[in-house]
A protein has these predicted regions:
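Short histidine/acidic/glycine/proline-rich micro-motifs that form metal-
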Residues: 38-41, 45, 71-75, 103-106, ...
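Short, well-ordered coil/turn elements that cap or connect secondary structure elements
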Residues: 14, 60-62, 127, 161
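Serine-esterase "nucleophile elbow" of acetyl-processing enzymes
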Residues: 20-73, 79, 83-92
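Alpha-helical cap/lid subdomain in secreted, periplasmic
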Residues: 81-208
């Protein structure tokens, strides 16, 4: 009798967990990239832009998803905040991938300011019932350990506060590796873009 009860309890728990996973799955037909030069295609021809590569990669895996790009080179989180409302005047997307913060770090902007700007951007997107994939960035140690600690913590904090889908580091496997970067060692080359695309693709597919 005890064994039967335990079995029933196990089935109930398994069913609840399985349902919760299914509830988090989302239907994705359209994606927006919203970032800076790391997403905009800086130094690359149009066919090598992240939006183009990601769309092709998803299609090769059997997913027909339109990937749009509203990333602008040089944008800080403040710049992104100032223009985001106009992007959604007549368009909505199933998933918005946020890739902002690198230029804030390069300019030494107070991490508290960066975080507040990102909070406002996130809230605008969520109010329009669009899902978010937040990509993280890390600060260079040359900014100082205190700055780096505060900046690096921005992204996991936002992930937890808003329960967001999260990619801890946009440039995972790419940063500071000559093979994957242009001569400035900052902006990804085609190989770098392909690696970023593959990393994003795996997360996106897991969401569906």
């Amino acid at each position: 009798m005890i064994k039967i009860k335990n079995f029933i309890i196990f089935i109930i728990i398994f069913s609840v967990l399985n349902c919760s996973k299914e509830d988090k799955k989302i239907k994705i037909n359209s994606i927006l990239l919203f970032g800076d030069s790391l997403m905009s295609g800086y130094g690359l021809i149009e066919e090598e832009h992240l939006s183009k590569i990601l769309e092709k990669d998803l299609k090769l895996d059997g997913y027909s998803i339109n990937v749009s790009n509203e990333s602008i080179s040089g944008d800080t989180t403040f710049d992104g905040l100032n223009r985001i409302e106009n992007i959604f005047l007549d368009k909505n997307y199933d998933l918005v991938i946020i890739g902002l913060g690198a230029n804030d770090m390069l300019r030494g902007i107070n991490p508290n300011v960066t975080k507040k700007n990102l909070e406002k951007i996130i809230e605008i997107i969520l109010k329009k019932n669009m899902k978010i994939l937040l990509t993280g960035m890390v600060a260079s140690p040359t900014r100082g350990l205190e700055y780096k600690k505060k900046f690096d913590q921005i992204f996991p904090d936002l992930k937890n506060t808003y329960d967001l889908n999260f990619m801890p580091f946009l440039l995972k496997g790419v940063a500071l590796r000559p093979k994957y970067n242009q001569s400035d060692l900052i902006h990804p080359n085609l190989l770098g873009i392909k690696l970023i695309s593959n990393n994003l693709k795996e997360i996106i597919i897991d969401l569906m």
